[in-house]
Structure formats: C-alpha cells, structure tokens
C-alpha cells in the first residue's frame, strides 16, 4: 500500500515576498510532499503590486529554494482559504508566526477555518530568529524612505520595489 501524499498550502498576500516568507516555505517543504504557495488577491489590503506581479516574484524566489524533495507550486487564489486548500487536496495549511500579535489573528483564523472544515489542520511555524521581525509592510516603508532592504527580500524583489518607488516618485 502506498503512503498517502502529504499536501499543504501556504497562503499569503506576498506584497512583496520576503526572506521571512521564503524561510517558512523552505521549512514547510521539509514536512510535506507537495506544497502549494497560494498568492491571495486580497484587494482589501491595497497591494503595491498586482496579483500577476506578486505571483511572478514568488515563483522566481521559490525556484531558487531547496525543495527537500517536495514539489512546490505557486498559484493565485481569490476564494476562501479553506476552499482553496480543499481544491489543492491539502490536509494542512501552514502559517508563520512572528510575534504575539500574529498569534491572536492566526488563532482566530484557525478557529474559523476549523469550523469550515475540521479535516484540514493549521500548522504554525515560528519565524526563525533571523526573520522574526521582517514584514512586507516594514520592507515597503523602509524601501520607500530610502533604507537598505537587501537583507529582507531576494535581490529580484528588491529591484522591483526600488523600480516601483522610483516610478511613484516620478509620477507624484
């Protein structure tokens, strides 16, 4: 009898993808056979980058990660997270935690997701020490104000951010 394939999703807005996100993706890939990184539309957050741009940035970053034998795919999604997870055949949703403030939000979301489908487990991974303070919001703010963001995002993401900030400054 063949063992059941371990399938999970790791959802996020990824506006932009950071080294913290990539740390979670890499670590999650060690625990499953197939990991789908779901890039959420999330128009309510008013993303800096379009959905297509965010998907492409995540794909380029993930292509450079060690997969630990797992298959990692990157796809956009616009529906409920639980519906997305089920459509992917996932039995797990990975979420990263940086601080207590993350936990409060994630705890509530986990409870709601469990009510929607108790067969899909939420697995929390603590941010590594080197990435526990990184957030997309802070990266954008630091970059917009001229700070060095190279240690927080992959080089291709840094370049896209700097180009976008330059475009915004020219049109202002």
Curated annotation (Swiss-Prot):
The record marks 21 as: Transition state stabilizer. Its EC number is 2.7.7.3. ATP binds at residues 13-14, 21, 96-98, 106, 131-137. GO terms for molecular function: ATP binding; pantetheine-phosphate adenylyltransferase activity. Disulfide bonds: none annotated. It catalyses: (R)-4'-phosphopantetheine + ATP + H(+) = 3'-dephospho-CoA + diphosphate. GO terms for biological process: coenzyme A biosynthetic process. Pathway: Cofactor biosynthesis; coenzyme A biosynthesis; CoA from (R)-pantothenate: step 4/5. GO terms for cellular component: cytoplasm. Gene3D superfamilies: HUPs. It holds the Pfam family CTP_transf_like. InterPro entries: Cyt_trans-like, PPAT, Rossmann-like_a/b/a_fold. Keywords: ATP-binding, Coenzyme A biosynthesis, Cytoplasm, Magnesium, Nucleotide-binding, Nucleotidyltransferase, Transferase. Substrate binds at residues 13, 45, 81, 95. Its cofactor is Mg(2+). It is found in: Cytoplasm. Homohexamer. PANTHER family: PHOSPHOPANTETHEINE ADENYLYLTRANSFERASE. Belongs to the bacterial CoaD family. Reversibly transfers an adenylyl group from ATP to 4'-phosphopantetheine, yielding dephospho-CoA (dPCoA) and pyrophosphate. This is Phosphopantetheine adenylyltransferase. It comes from Rhodospirillum rubrum (strain ATCC 11170 / ATH 1.1.1 / DSM 467 / LMG 4362 / NCIMB 8255 / S1).
């Amino acid at each position: 009898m063949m063992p059941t394939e371990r399938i999970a999703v790791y959802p996020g807005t990824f506006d932009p993808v950071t080294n913290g996100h990539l740390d979670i993706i890499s670590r999650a890939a060690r625990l499953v056979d197939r990991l789908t990184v779901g890039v959420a539309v999330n128009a309510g957050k008013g993303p800096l980058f379009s959905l297509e741009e965010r998907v492409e940035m995540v794909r380029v970053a993930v292509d450079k990660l060690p997969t630990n034998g797992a298959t990692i795919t990157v796809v956009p999604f616009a529906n409920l997270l639980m519906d997305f997870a089920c459509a992917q055949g996932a039995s797990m949703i990975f979420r990263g935690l940086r601080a207590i403030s993350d936990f409060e939000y994630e705890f509530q979301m986990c409870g709601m997701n469990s009510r929607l489908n108790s067969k899909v487990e939420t697995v929390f991974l603590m941010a590594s020490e080197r990435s526990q303070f990184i957030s997309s919001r802070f990266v954008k703010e630091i970059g917009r104000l001229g700070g060095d963001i190279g240690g927080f995002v992959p080089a291709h993401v840094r370049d896209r951010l700097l180009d976008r900030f330059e475009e915004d400054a020219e049109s202002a």
